[in-house]
């Protein structure tokens, strides 16, 4: 495994500074290293399913850990925001969320038959007049022109069928995933388009009213969140 010094891990990694000097890195994949955790660290240091890398390799090779419904067998596989980890043998599931400090945290779910939330980062035209939707977790799916950039989709897993379409518009609920308001949720009150090289901004009303840049905002529901945001946090 490729390693880095524990003291130099990204700020989004909620791992202790004490322990082994070296810690594994993520492999290039659906999420960047700055916005994901290696699966090996999750099963060893957070869920405490194993004591070492050798045991981790064994349970992954046996298909006992699913990410978004797919068995993953690489200790360095990157697990990022909104990804769902399922442990079929113990009938448990967890969703990766972000806390107010921008750190990735695993929240235990009440059931294992859950869906996945994704944001449409951009879309491209493909043959037949259809559109390829490029999602925030690296997934690409074919959809129609009704789906807009910055909209969110609720997808079934592992087959990634659209269960619900959430528009990026005033009145819907959103989560902030970057900046000083990271981890906060609230209602979109205004979307301010800037006719310059500066970022578009969004006014959000939650526990307080605040403004953040558009790229940090992900729609999570209409009248209520479409995904469970609470639950026991694994540390």
Swiss-Prot record:
InterPro entries, sorted: KOW, Rib_uL2_dom2, Ribosomal_eS4, Ribosomal_eS4_central_region, Ribosomal_eS4_central_sf, Ribosomal_eS4_KOW, Ribosomal_eS4_N, Ribosomal_eS4_N_CS
Q: Name one GO cellular component term.
A: cytosolic small ribosomal subunit
SMART domains per record:
KOW (SM00739)
Q: Where is the S4 RNA-binding domain?
A: 37-100
Lyase keyword on record:
no
Pfam families listed in its UniProt record? Ribosomal_S4e, RS4NT
Annotated Gene3D superfamilies: 2.30.30.30, 2.40.50.740, RNA-binding S4 domain
Which HAMAP family does the UniProt record give? Ribosomal_eS4
The record's family statement is: Belongs to the eukaryotic ribosomal protein eS4 family.
Protein name per Swiss-Prot or TrEMBL? Small ribosomal subunit protein eS4
| Gene source species | Methanosarcina acetivorans (strain ATCC 35395 / DSM 2834 / JCM 12185 / C2A)
**Gene symbol?**
rps4e
């Amino acid at each position: 495994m490729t390693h880095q010094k524990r003291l130099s891990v990204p700020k989004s990694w909620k791992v202790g500074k004490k322990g082994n000097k070296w810690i594994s890195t993520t492999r290039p994949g659906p999420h960047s290293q700055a916005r994901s955790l290696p699966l090996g660290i999750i099963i060893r240091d957070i869920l405490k399913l194993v004591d070492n890398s050798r045991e981790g390799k064994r349970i992954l090779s046996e298909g006992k850990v699913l990410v978004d419904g797919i068995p993953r067998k690489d200790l360095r596989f990157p697990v990022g925001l909104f990804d769902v980890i399922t442990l079929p043998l113990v009938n448990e599931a967890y969703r990766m969320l972000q806390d107010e400090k921008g750190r990735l945290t695993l929240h235990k779910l009440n059931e294992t038959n859950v869906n996945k939330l994704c944001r449409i980062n951009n879309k491209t035209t493909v043959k037949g007049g259809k559109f390829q939707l490029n999602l925030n977790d690296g997934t690409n799916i074919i959809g129609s022109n009704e789906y807009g950039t910055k909209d969110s989709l609720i997808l079934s897993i592992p087959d990634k069928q659209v269960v619900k379409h959430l528009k990026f518009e005033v009145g819907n609920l959103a989560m902030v995933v970057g900046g000083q308001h990271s981890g906060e949720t609230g209602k979109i009150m205004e979307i301010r388009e800037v006719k310059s090289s500066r970022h578009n901004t969004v006014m959000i009303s939650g526990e307080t009213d605040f403004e953040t840049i558009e790229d940090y905002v992900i729609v999570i529901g209409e009248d209520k969140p479409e995904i469970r945001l609470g639950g026991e946090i694994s540390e």
